[in-house]
């Protein structure tokens, strides 16, 4: 946006209400693949016992994802996306458009905020696992040498790597770190059986060092800090395979 764009208020749509909706990254990427100004899906707004329910259904021809992180893949994106409605919270939010001549036009006032979340089905769980697996791959890869290394190294009593490894092994109670993807699989499997776990039980299940396990848990879970499930862990909403009951005010 230009620093000194001209604001055009001619016919300003100050009474036009617009929605501000947060959507998953993969969904916006699939929308971008739609030809021209074609249809990307259907929005459904209904009333259920006086409450507004909104959901978005992605077109079937846009559900196929062929790459993740620039790497070839073959997975189906979730098609059903229920909305979580949120209040504007007393804020005044507006939407502007900018023309090629740097003119700004007021398009409307934000009257509703929402988050478009995927239904936690098998397609979505597989997509998230592939995304986590791709993001967990090391940037540096080992390379096989075709020549013998002849560089001479002076012998030392103990290498720094070994010293550090022994120190960590003592701190972690001699627990060895497993591959991250393997730990994720164990955690997802555990949370399919129960919604809540304390950290000690998850350590017993995965046999992983506490600090290492907590780092992985923070990626897929949240720790409850109050209520009857205080100090327990559960999956983030986007990873859950169950429906959370609505809490009464």
From Swiss-Prot:
Recorded name of the encoding gene: GTF2F2
One annotated GO biological process: transcription by RNA polymerase II
Keyword Phosphoprotein: yes
Matching SUPFAM superfamilies: Rap30/74 interaction domains, Winged helix' DNA-binding domain
Binding-site residues, DNA: 227, 229
Keywords, ordered alphabetically: Acetylation, DNA-binding, Nucleus, Phosphoprotein, Transcription, Transcription regulation
Modified residues (Phosphoserine): 142, 248
GO molecular function, one term: DNA binding
Modification type N-acetylalanine: residues: 2
Name of protein: General transcription factor IIF subunit 2
Assembly and binders: Heterodimer of an alpha and a beta subunit. Interacts with HTATSF1 and GPBP1. Interacts with URI1. Interacts with GTF2B (via N-terminus); this interaction is inhibited in presence of GTF2F1.
Physiological role: TFIIF is a general transcription initiation factor that binds to RNA polymerase II and helps to recruit it to the initiation complex in collaboration with TFIIB.
Gene3D superfamilies reported in the protein's UniProt record: Winged helix-like DNA-binding domain superfamily/Winged helix DNA-binding domain (1.10.10.10)
Family: Belongs to the TFIIF beta subunit family.
InterPro entries linked: TFIIF_beta, TFIIF_beta_HTH, TFIIF_beta_N, TFIIF_interaction, WH-like_DNA-bd_sf, WH_DNA-bd_sf
Modified residues (N6-acetyllysine): 22, 33, 137
Location(s), subcellular: Nucleus
Primary residence: nucleus
Entry's Gene Ontology cellular component terms: transcription factor TFIIF complex
One Pfam family recorded for the sequence: TFIIF_beta
